[in-house]
Amino acid sequence: MDKVKALIKAHKLIIFSKTTCPYCISVKDLFKKLKVVPFVVELDLESDGSELQSAAGQISGVRTVPQVFINEKFIGGCDATTKLHSQGKLIPLLQEAGFL
């Protein structure tokens, strides 16, 4: 859990993801379209990926991926992140974090 907390603290925008997950790909594509480069942890490529996913899940309350954190706050997975964007609420969060 300490490693995940340290990663979340060190990166203003971090996504816990898996390379083959379509929802993960969608949320990464959204940030790409916004010209924002998140720090991405591909859990399926990490030797301790299962432990990292469990720890991230304890912090977020969600076990599934993707898990998106902005400024150390869990904002949700793909659906929640996409919804925030469609409501005009994602851009201000990214601006606050210094991305736009």
UniProtKB/Swiss-Prot annotation:
Domain Glutaredoxin: 1-100
Gene3D superfamilies attached to this UniProt entry: Glutaredoxin
Alphabetical UniProt keywords: Cytoplasm, Disulfide bond, Electron transport, Redox-active center, Transport
Main location (coarse class): cytoplasm
GO biological process: cell redox homeostasis; cellular response to oxidative stress; culmination involved in sorocarp development; response to oxidative stress
SS bond partners: C21-C24
Domain of life: Eukaryota
Localization in the cell: Cytoplasm
Gene Ontology CC terms, in alphabetical order: cytoplasm
Alphabetized GO MF terms: glutathione binding; glutathione disulfide oxidoreductase activity; glutathione transferase activity; NADP binding
Function: Has a glutathione-disulfide oxidoreductase activity in the presence of NADPH and glutathione reductase. Reduces low molecular weight disulfides and proteins. Affects the culmination and cell fate decision by modulating the levels of reduced glutathione.
Family label: Belongs to the glutaredoxin family.
PANTHER family named among the record's database cross-references: GLUTAREDOXIN 2 (PTHR45694), GLUTAREDOXIN-1-RELATED (PTHR45694:SF18)
Protein's UniProt name: Glutaredoxin
Lineage: Eukaryota, Amoebozoa, Evosea, Eumycetozoa, Dictyostelia
